[in-house]
Amino acid sequence: SSDLVFLDTIEAIHKKRSDIQFVIPAANEHRLVQIEAFLAQSDDAQSRLPIHITTGTARDAMIASDVILLASGTATLEAMLCKRPMVVAYKLAPLTYKIMQRIYKAPYFALPNLLANDAIVPELLQEDVNAENMSNQLLGFFESDNSALISRFTELHHTLKCDADKT
């Protein structure tokens, strides 16, 4: 499941960089309880790893973050507007993926890439969604100058605001 691969990614990053803290935003108290239960069942991950679960807006967690790992969707747009480097990972059921391959012809699936019409953030799909790939991509942001990416996010944000003003 994607929950396990995200947790495996945290473990892989922690092995290489024990100074990095991890934040998991919970949409509400019910989700908080679910996340805590999942982590407890996962070899008590929360006590072994520097994981902090927050409630409230995901936006606050994004702003507090250096890099973000997320599944595709509107959260990618929010991360872009917060000007945070991100890795977008998405895994569909095999049959759903086969159907989508026939129907969906856009070159990208992450909203920032679709808006830019360019691969500005890493997209991992299906078999590429694994802890090794995700941890390497995320750690890469810590070792890079991300100013060009942030500038691109700023341009896209401006374009969105201008387009919104025209309607």
Residue spans for each PLM region:
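Nucleotide-activated sugar donor-binding and catalytic core shared by glycosyltransferases
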Residues: 2-167
